[in-house]
């Protein structure tokens, strides 16, 4: 079906800029953008349907390129403890922290995980999200990582959005491998990844490169295996310290390196050369009350593409609003509203390996877009909360009005 969408203004986000078109029209057909431009330049078109957008601003559908949306349990009690002065180490010694989420996730059935994740993902969708990534990483064994990734696939099947599933088995050391990190990495490489990839459950491979998680050498073993399996890689890097994990990610042409508060100029140069996207996660920065800022000037100076994401997870960023992350990116990291919007559209698409099909409003790309009740694109980063989406369109079909 061919649809003409008109009486709107468009921020195409081509090349990471607003690239605004006033009084625009969009023609969609077969799920793709067939034509876009000033309405005055549109030749007569035979449309099956014409939609008047009432002067709304239209942007690409938002893309949340880093989430841990599938998990069991709830850690709000730990939030209260931390506000009362209990340290993370003390909470962990009590059996809390990521270990508590692993226990709850392992104990939950696939249907239970699906039901809770479904609610969280729907909250993101109400904010204009049409594409998101979901990581595993709270199962930490084959059966439970499979369970999490199956939930991600089910969400893609049952909700009108695009989901990319990332295997993050190298998120933390499971209790049964305490003190044996090398053995656990070998288990992931020899058994878990081949099995999960063989079942078609994995779109990318991620790891957590930190002193409290896995070393660069261990991560590299994982990357080598991912490359053998034909899977792209991503990396949690430089969140708490500088191990040059982002440079390691760049050497393996990673789609992205994420967090990056402690990255160096050398890391930025490597990422720029490899085309690796810097995914910044202001929700975790805010929630943990961190003080070390990502090196924004170095990222800009070397032309590294910058994305933003919610990092939705139960321990460090229980954020259900990607639009809130736009504001946090501006207020916490000194991004411009234009940079922030590019960070959840065109650059987020690149961070998921979808840059050729998603993330900007251009002829031939997927017709995912949002019509917003705003006066200008900067409003998306300006307003805190509120119901701003007027219509959400995925593959040329309205999913919200």
From Swiss-Prot:
<feature type="binding site">
    <location>
        <position position="316"/>
    </location>
    <ligand>
        <name>4-imidazolone-5-propanoate</name>
    </ligand>
</feature>
<feature type="binding site">
    <location>
        <position position="68"/>
    </location>
    <ligand>
        <name>Zn(2+)</name>
    </ligand>
</feature>
<comment type="function">
    <text>Catalyzes the hydrolytic cleavage of the carbon-nitrogen bond in imidazolone-5-propanoate to yield N-formimidoyl-L-glutamate. It is the third step in the universal histidine degradation pathway.</text>
</comment>
<feature type="binding site">
    <location>
        <position position="68"/>
    </location>
    <ligand>
        <name>Fe(3+)</name>
    </ligand>
</feature>
<dbReference type="GO" id="GO:0019557">
    <property type="term" value="P:L-histidine catabolic process to glutamate and formate"/>
</dbReference>
<dbReference type="InterPro" id="IPR011059">
    <property type="entry name" value="Metal-dep_hydrolase_composite"/>
</dbReference>
<dbReference type="InterPro" id="IPR006680">
    <property type="entry name" value="Amidohydro-rel"/>
</dbReference>
<dbReference type="GO" id="GO:0019556">
    <property type="term" value="P:L-histidine catabolic process to glutamate and formamide"/>
</dbReference>
<dbReference type="GO" id="GO:0005506">
    <property type="term" value="F:iron ion binding"/>
</dbReference>
<comment type="similarity">
    <text>Belongs to the metallo-dependent hydrolases superfamily. HutI family.</text>
</comment>
<feature type="binding site">
    <location>
        <position position="315"/>
    </location>
    <ligand>
        <name>N-formimidoyl-L-glutamate</name>
    </ligand>
</feature>
<feature type="binding site">
    <location>
        <position position="66"/>
    </location>
    <ligand>
        <name>Fe(3+)</name>
    </ligand>
</feature>
<feature type="binding site">
    <location>
        <position position="311"/>
    </location>
    <ligand>
        <name>Zn(2+)</name>
    </ligand>
</feature>
<feature type="binding site">
    <location>
        <position position="239"/>
    </location>
    <ligand>
        <name>4-imidazolone-5-propanoate</name>
    </ligand>
</feature>
<dbReference type="InterPro" id="IPR032466">
    <property type="entry name" value="Metal_Hydrolase"/>
</dbReference>
<feature type="binding site">
    <location>
        <position position="66"/>
    </location>
    <ligand>
        <name>Zn(2+)</name>
    </ligand>
</feature>
<keyword id="KW-0862">Zinc</keyword>
<dbReference type="GO" id="GO:0008270">
    <property type="term" value="F:zinc ion binding"/>
</dbReference>
<keyword id="KW-0378">Hydrolase</keyword>
<dbReference type="GO" id="GO:0005737">
    <property type="term" value="C:cytoplasm"/>
</dbReference>
<feature type="binding site">
    <location>
        <position position="75"/>
    </location>
    <ligand>
        <name>4-imidazolone-5-propanoate</name>
    </ligand>
</feature>
<keyword id="KW-0963">Cytoplasm</keyword>
<dbReference type="Pfam" id="PF01979">
    <property type="entry name" value="Amidohydro_1"/>
</dbReference>
<feature type="binding site">
    <location>
        <position position="311"/>
    </location>
    <ligand>
        <name>Fe(3+)</name>
    </ligand>
</feature>
<dbReference type="InterPro" id="IPR005920">
    <property type="entry name" value="HutI"/>
</dbReference>
<keyword id="KW-0408">Iron</keyword>
<comment type="pathway">
    <text>Amino-acid degradation; L-histidine degradation into L-glutamate; N-formimidoyl-L-glutamate from L-histidine: step 3/3.</text>
</comment>
<feature type="binding site">
    <location>
        <position position="236"/>
    </location>
    <ligand>
        <name>Fe(3+)</name>
    </ligand>
</feature>
<feature type="binding site">
    <location>
        <position position="171"/>
    </location>
    <ligand>
        <name>4-imidazolone-5-propanoate</name>
    </ligand>
</feature>
<dbReference type="GO" id="GO:0050480">
    <property type="term" value="F:imidazolonepropionase activity"/>
</dbReference>
<feature type="binding site">
    <location>
        <position position="236"/>
    </location>
    <ligand>
        <name>Zn(2+)</name>
    </ligand>
</feature>
<feature type="binding site">
    <location>
        <position position="313"/>
    </location>
    <ligand>
        <name>N-formimidoyl-L-glutamate</name>
    </ligand>
</feature>
<feature type="binding site">
    <location>
        <position position="138"/>
    </location>
    <ligand>
        <name>4-imidazolone-5-propanoate</name>
    </ligand>
</feature>
<feature type="binding site">
    <location>
        <position position="138"/>
    </location>
    <ligand>
        <name>N-formimidoyl-L-glutamate</name>
    </ligand>
</feature>
<protein>
    <recommendedName>
        <fullName>Imidazolonepropionase</fullName>
        <ecNumber>3.5.2.7</ecNumber>
    </recommendedName>
</protein>
<keyword id="KW-0369">Histidine metabolism</keyword>
<keyword id="KW-0479">Metal-binding</keyword>
